[in-house]
Every structure is written in C-alpha cells, then in structure tokens.
C-alpha cells in the first residue's frame, strides 16, 4: 500500500500544476489561475505585492485598501518602465508610452497622451486625445483627437477633433466637434461652444464663438471679438473688438449697430448706438449734465431778446430762424435731439416774451383809446 501511494503522488501533484511552458487538454471550468475560496488573487515580484484582484472583482494596484492611491501608477496597454512619477493611469494601446516624469495624468484610449513626457494633471479620454502634448499640464481632452496636436496648458476640449490644431496656446475651451480645430501658434484664452465654431481660427486671443458653425472662416490675429448664433461670421479675417449677435446686433470697438453692420458715419465721433429703420418706443429720457443746457435763461432780466425788426431782417435774408440749422445742414449732419429740443424751447420762450410785450403794448393802446373816447 505504501508503494502504491508513492507511485501516484507525482501524478496527483502534476494534476494540480500549471506549466510555465504551456498546457494542453484544458477545461476552463477546472483549469484556471485563481482562488476557489473567498480570498484575493495576489501578484508579486521580488516578494512585493503589485496587483490584487479582490473577490468582488476590483483591481487593487500597489496600494493598501485604506490608503489613497496617488503614490502609484496603473497602466494597462500603455505607459513604460522608465516612468518615475506617480498617480498616472493609462488604459489603451500606445497611451502614455513616452512618459518619464509627468504625474497624476489619466489617459484612456488608443494613443491618448502618447507624447506626454513631463506634464501633470492632464486627462485624455478618446483615441488620440492629447496625443502630442509633451510638457503641458492641466489639460482635458474628451473625444477622438481632442487636443490631438495641442501642447499648451489649461485647455479644455469636448468633442471629436475639438482644439485639435498644433498650438502652444493656453486657457482655450472648445465644446463641440471640430470646434477650434485649426488653432495654431499661441492662440490663447478663446472659447468656442458649438460644432465647427471657430473652425479655422488660426491665431488670436480672448475671442468667443457660440453656435453651430459660428465664426468658422479663416481667421488670423483675431482678438477680443464675440460671435453668437448659428452661422454668424466676422466682417473680416482679422477682427478686433468685434461683436455679432444673430446677424442683427453688431459691434465695433464699443459702438453698437442694430440691423446694420455699418457702425460708423461722417461726423459721428462719440456716438455708441446706430439703429437702422428707426426706433419705436413708449418712453425716452434724455439727461442733461447741468441746468445751462436748458433754456430758462431766456427769462433772466439781462437776456438780450432780438427785436422783431431785426428778426424780420434775418429771416428775409437767411430763410430760417437764428441759431436754427438750415434744411441742408440737417440733411448733411442730422439733428442732436437733446440740443434741438432745448433750442426749440428757447425759440418758444423768445416768442412768448414777444407776445407778452406785444400784449402790454396793446393794453396801453386800448387804455389810451378809452381815454380819448371819454374826452369826446
């Protein structure tokens, strides 16, 4: 009996082994690597635990359950063996493969964060997202090719090919497929919301585009411009301080046009609002800087009222009242509503003074006539 046990012992041992050179005639229900009790499967090298698969199916990588995991890297299909920093996560073939000193990056998708060497706190989610970023930090790219060629910092892109271009710019935000796709050089502080918005913005800073295909033409050196509405476009290829809302409200250097993109005119320095086809409103309030702008001074004792004879002579020669602009002048230059109302009031007050004086003369004449009639 003792000899029989010794004979079958090697067979029993071989039945429980998993050969390093490969196995055949396996059955997946009974041949596997793992545990049959409620314990974790642990992987070690040099007797140091690196990976643990919990009975619940969770992966615990080089970490104690109760401690945060920012001091480790988790790499599946990406990363490399020379990575010295911590807190990186890579899932995807070719993802994060050039990393060296960068830390706390997340790369999910084929070639995501592929070129990053020393950047920190980047997130790339999608094939080729943040693929060429080398040293940039705090970027977020979500979508295939999002931030694909960008190399700057603090950029956010959501959508296929959003912020894809070869740019070193910072602080850009692109939401929507192909938004800010063509940025180059140091384009910074731009915001594009809507598919294809700022599609071909090459260079420029502090610009905003909201809407589908908004400001999508070729733009260079654009700055401080805002475009809102689907298919709304700039008036030129290098706009500065420009506004276009729905092709109805336009702005240029702080001057606004409603219904017209022409916000300039002759002798219009200092004006800020231009409205085509008129304004209809129930209430307008015009403010005056001081009392001198109104015409009450006409009633002061020292006011020099133009005699009626002189007024008649002026009208005969000039065909208009003193101080009142000619018809041609109005055609050429328009009217200042506030000043013209004050001028009209002045003329009414002067007319009132003439009427009062004439009435006094009439009363004196009536009194004299009555006296003469009584003498008779």
What are these regions (language model features)?
Residues 1-18, 358, 365, 372:
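Bacterial Sec-dependent N-terminal signal peptides
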Residues 11-27, 220-228:
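Short, basic/low-complexity N-terminal boundary segments at the transition from targeting/disordered tails
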Residues 17-25, 44-49, 55, 61-71, ...:
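C-terminal intramolecular chaperone/autoprocessing and neck/assembly modules of extracellular spikes
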Residues 32, 37-272, 276:
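Glycine- and small/polar-enriched repetitive beta-structure motifs of secreted/surface proteins
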Residues 341-345:
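Amphipathic, non-membrane alpha-helical segments that mediate helix-helix packing
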